[in-house]
Amino acid sequence: MARRGKGGVGVGDAAWRRGAARPRLLVVSAVAWALLLLAFHLWSCASPSAYFLSALCRKGGEVVRASDPMEPPSKPLHRCSIPVVDDPDAVVIPKRTPNEIVKKLSYITVDKRDKDSPPLFGGRQTWKQREESFKVNATMKVHCGFMKNSGADMDAVDAEYIQKCKFVVASGIFDGYDIPHQPSNISLRSQKLFCFLMVVDEVSIDFIEQNVTVKVDSEGGKWVGIWRLVTLHRPPFDEPRRNGKVPKILTHRLFPQAWYSIWIDGKMELMVDPLLILERYLWRGKYTFAVAVHKHHRSIYEEGDAIKRRKRYARPLVDLQMKIYYHEGMEPWDAKKRTPSDIPEGAVLIREHTTIVDLFSCLWFNEVNLFTPRDQLSFGYVVHRLGDTLKFFMFPNCEYNSLFILHRHTREHSSKVEWAKTIPEIVKNGLKESRGGLGLWTPYPADLSSVKLPAVKRTSQAG
């Protein structure tokens, strides 16, 4: 019979309890180690070493995106499998979509200007010309960048190379903020079918040549892995963010032979075969344009509020752009609208270059050129103005997060105008851009003083 201690507990009972505690201790220790390993895994995916540890950041073909240190803390990104077909070789490329709405689209390349005024890349679009450009007709002529002698000049060797490019994966690096990241899971068929074109400025080509291996082919073309580097000389804008909008939005102007294009931002590593992307997002649903829903915002007014809070552009100029849009009939997004959001994830754009899609791109760029360079603000406005003439696919954000790995910029981007709080501060400190955003300084043909922006309710603490 077991002896009992003073507390009335048998010695055998105490020994049994000590023995039972050991497995619990082992379980607790195992859980602690698992949490420690998980923390290291998440840290490694977000650290610079993720480039070398990328295998740890992927699972089952679904990509775990490393977080951007410039973004505010947020909940873990929701990812889902992309319903692509199994084999790129099995994809049947359909006939091109006929141009049924806008049959002929041409571009204004020379503006009326003072004799001593330099040409502007985006032109000197008047308020009347802007309004007329939204009236869709069978034949249209609009501003679309690339005014004569205004910059963004391409080397002859690159201009000749792109003549053959009908299927394009395009990206861009400006002001040395990134280095090219090699795409993964690219089939042999797509390697032969697609041109992978990395558009860079002179600052970036110098930075890239100093930090990665650049090979020069027999014709003088420069390559980093699969990427053909295309250097643009004479940047058209003072602000690097605006320069980056040229290849992003005006892909059809830079590469006019392209039938299809996929744009990805320079800090991204593409993880899905581009032919599978076109099949999933364009051909399967018979769309000509696809873009993902924004992870946090639906309304341009909520996006504008986030831009101001995060100091992504001068607050009074963001307010002015939104006041113009609100005055012109752009209501906050709600579930009754025909699109799931007015705000896209603009880092990935998937397009068939029909005339209506190219018109949309021109009008979108014109808004970016006229107002702030924050293209997510103007995207929904242009969609609103074009109405039912533009049918496109806004796909789930969880699929967007599975298309790529996101790498950090090589350094933080910031310009002084982004921190400005008042118009007098911008003027006094000489922060006004000289070649872009001129609509923010040109008298608007209506009184905006009584316009009050709609109240903004934050739907996400991370946004």
Predicted segments with their positions:
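Glycosyltransferase catalytic domains, chiefly GT-A lineage
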Residues: 2-463
